[in-house]
Amino acid sequence: MAPPGVGVGVAYLWGKGRGGRKGTPVVVTMESPNYSVVEVDGPDAEAELRTAAVAMDKGGGRGRSRSRTARQLTWVLLLRARRAAGRLASFAAAAARRFRRSPADAADELGRGRGRLMYGFIRGFLALSLLALAVELAAYWNGWRLRRPELHVPEAVEIEGWAHSAYISWMSFRADYIRRPIEFLSKACILLFVIQSMDRLVLCLGCFWIKLRKIKPRIEGDPFREGSGYQHPMVLVQIPMCNEKEVYEQSISAACQLDWPREKFLIQVLDDSSDESIQLLIKAEVSKWSHQGVNIVYRHRVLRTGYKAGNLKSAMSCDYVKDYEFVAIFDADFQPTPDFLKKTIPHFEGNPELGLVQARWSFVNKDENLLTRLQNINLCFHFEVEQQVNGVFLNFFGFNGTAGVWRIQALEESGGWLERTTVEDMDIAVRAHLNGWKFIFLNDVKVLCELPESYEAYRKQQHRWHSGPMHLFRLCLPDILTAKISSWKKANLILLFFLLRKLILPFYSFTLFCVILPLTMFVPEAELPVWVICYVPVCMSFLNILPSPRSFPFIVPYLLFENTMSVTKFNAMVSGLFKLGSSYEWIVTKKSGRSSESDLSTAAERDTKDLTLPRLQKQISESELIELKMQKERQEKAPLGAKKANKVYKKELALSLLLLTAATRSLLSAQGIHFYFLLFQGVSFLFVGLDLIGEQID
């Protein structure tokens, strides 16, 4: 069912003098005094309004515009007034920010300072390690080397000059004063490492039990069989997007082809794009499908606050949302199969406590390069093990932000979408869990999407995914402690969901392998056990790869890359925990617009040629068609002419030099496994620091 008009329909104004031409009305929604939202329902009136605007620009309404009435031109002026008001409001907000320094601005400056502080720490550590290596090389050259210094300390008669005496004093100092703090910190990290490994092992055992007993959510009977009398509920489908011209067409197309009665679902295209040319392309795509009978509306916010959460919150405030029972959310690069709603909606039947049905992600570009292969390992474990086990045994997991269906009542009772963090999906999931709503995960329902193909895009995505949870933990902790849920659920939320899997994992990974291990090379009295460096990490990596057995040849690159990413994750965790500026950053992940199958692109091209142009020629002005074609040509030619360049990441490069320096020092102590681990890990940091993994940025 299309939404009822909340503005004023103007299709009848354009029908006069047009031979009775019919069209779907346009709704210009003025939902706030600053005219912050525009909603277009249907192709005809929007195209006519744009045609009138073009005609005015070309001579005050000569030619076709002579027959238009004053009322028609009034509507054009109203649209222009709306745009002017939006731009004026944006200008006023920008001017206000110039004279008023907000807490977010102060936090952003503090966050940048913290980033420089971490880089300075790594540089200082590197300088000290190079100095220590020079000292050890000089001692080795002079024959002062000791493979195990604690076994023998030279007597006074054995000391050869002041340099040898200084070296012996340095050995005594590090054995008496430096060794103990390093050993204490290493034992603490080893303890955290063992706890996290046990958690990973328990999750894998739970997944094995699910597979063995064939446990999964099931639908009673076949509700869609002929004569079953199934009453299709009203479903709202939301597609939030922002400047994603590479993927908008295929995501809208997939949503419009969902197998559900057309009068029973509505698609909202929530466009937060700042590029007007992209807005025009998305409007044309919406118009194409609307003309084919799909209930689809286009919404654009002039004042884009709150990122994705603000976009979804604005869409849920529409009056017609009260007519819908469920809402399905798909990000701009997701392509649901036509039977998605038939596989998810029936699970709500007879289960009033069920608030969320989450589907699994499947990736169209998982074999594109080494970076996408390594991401696929991580995400396969996340869905196959973490999400599935938590869904079966706890009825709770973190909402993945897309490819899920919410009961609208659950959203409303949990406070709706909040703009306080950049992980609005996890935020609403935690609040719904505290209100007693249950979740289920469907491992056999997969939705196609894309993985970031460049390290820059992946790095920014991981920063948001690891800073947001820590920021959310600060905000949710009082609510968790006072919530009316069982104590074991509170313990699971605090100890496992937040602390162990979001805080401890990046902390010990960075501290143990990037700080303590290099330190022990220059302070050999504090030695890390071999099983911590080699055996247990390899076993844990093997468990991670089990859900994607085809990735087994990449077990060693996966282990090294995860340790490399610990720098980004640790930095993000600190920024979120201490509410620094970078925890508020939201950068849309770069997409490439890859299709799932070869015939998908053929079908899209056929639809564009056979449906878009002929129908748009009837509904859109000639000038707009020319503009659309020019945008299409620029979109196709841009990737060909763009030059790709490598970006240098200073933190990763500095850590690479640090680890390679420590590897050189380990040779003097004849520590074979330590040497090889530090060597390969240092090379891994070097590859990442030089942006040699994944696709280079444009």
Curated annotation (Swiss-Prot):
Active site: D272, D425
EC code(s) of this entry: 2.4.1.-
GO MF, any single term: glycosyltransferase activity
Subcellular compartments: Golgi apparatus membrane
Membrane topology listed for this record: Multi-pass membrane protein
Cellular component, GO annotation: Golgi apparatus; Golgi membrane
Keyword Membrane on entry: yes
Keyword list, A-Z: Cell wall biogenesis/degradation, Glycosyltransferase, Golgi apparatus, Membrane, Transferase, Transmembrane, Transmembrane helix
Main location: Golgi
Name of the protein in its database record: Probable xyloglucan glycosyltransferase 2
Organism: Oryza sativa subsp. japonica
Lineage: Eukaryota, Viridiplantae, Streptophyta, Embryophyta, Tracheophyta
Gene name, Swiss-Prot/TrEMBL: CSLC2
